[in-house]
């Protein structure tokens, strides 16, 4: 399965190297870098000791949207305070969600933000699920390399599961659901309700395959009734 880790605008080459080393240790091999050239600094390879192949094969993208273009389901790490009205999953919950998603999507990605400011709200809107690491400190802080290690350790089980090939159309269920819900909110004249829209979009990320199929049926019935009502 395609499952890259994506680092958005990393500033410190040492953090890229540490991320690559953590990935290698836990069996992850695909690294994508967005809007940064820090990976070319010699410090990247020095810190990535033993994980030079990940550095050699990393892919660079101009924007997060470009890096996610071939991804069916994406998860972004963020602090709870940045989450607005969104659903917020722990690393343990993310593991269970991705193990289920692995049965019916063809590609997944884990996104990490900038060292100093994380991901913008616009970037958070591009992913399917948000997650963060619960910490006890009053002013909790993990550097990028540490955060990558936590998630690679937690999600290592994904590398041990042989996922079946996704059936045609299944991998696109979530994207289709998002589009249908957005269109329905417009038709109901409630698209300006940001809190509800955010809640709906983020809750889609935790749906299992059967739930997604049932929601498609429900939306179909709602859309049909709206058409019949307008026609009457």
Range-by-range predicted roles:
Residues 1-232:
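Post-transcriptional modification and biogenesis factors for structured RNAs
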């Amino acid at each position: 399965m395609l499952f890259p880790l994506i680092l958005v605008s990393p500033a410190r080459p040492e953090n890229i190297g540490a991320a690559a080393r953590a990935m290698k240790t836990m069996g992850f091999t695909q690294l994508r870098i967005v809007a940064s050239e820090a990976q070319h600094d010699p410090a990247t390879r020095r810190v990535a000791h033993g994980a030079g192949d990940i550095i050699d094969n990393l892919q660079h993208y101009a924007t997060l949207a470009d890096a996610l273009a071939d991804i069916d389901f994406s998860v972004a790490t963020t602090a709870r305070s940045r989450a607005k009205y969104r659903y917020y999953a722990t690393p343990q919950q993310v593991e269970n969600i991705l193990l289920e998603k692995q049965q019916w999507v063809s590609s997944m990605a884990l996104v990490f933000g900038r060292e100093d400011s994380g991901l913008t709200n616009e970037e958070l809107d591009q992913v399917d699920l948000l997650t963060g690491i619960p910490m006890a400190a009053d002013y909790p802080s993990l550097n990028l390399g540490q955060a990558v290690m936590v998630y690679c350790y937690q999600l290592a089980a994904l590398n041990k599961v042989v996922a079946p090939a996704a059936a045609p159309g299944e991998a696109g269920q979530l994207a289709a659901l998002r589009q249908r819900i957005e269109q329905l909110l417009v038709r109901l004249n409630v698209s300006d309700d940001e809190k509800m829209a955010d809640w709906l979009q983020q809750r889609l990320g935790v749906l299992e395959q059967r739930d997604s199929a049932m929601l498609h049926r429900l939306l179909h019935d709602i859309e049909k009734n709206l058409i019949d009502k307008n026609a009457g």
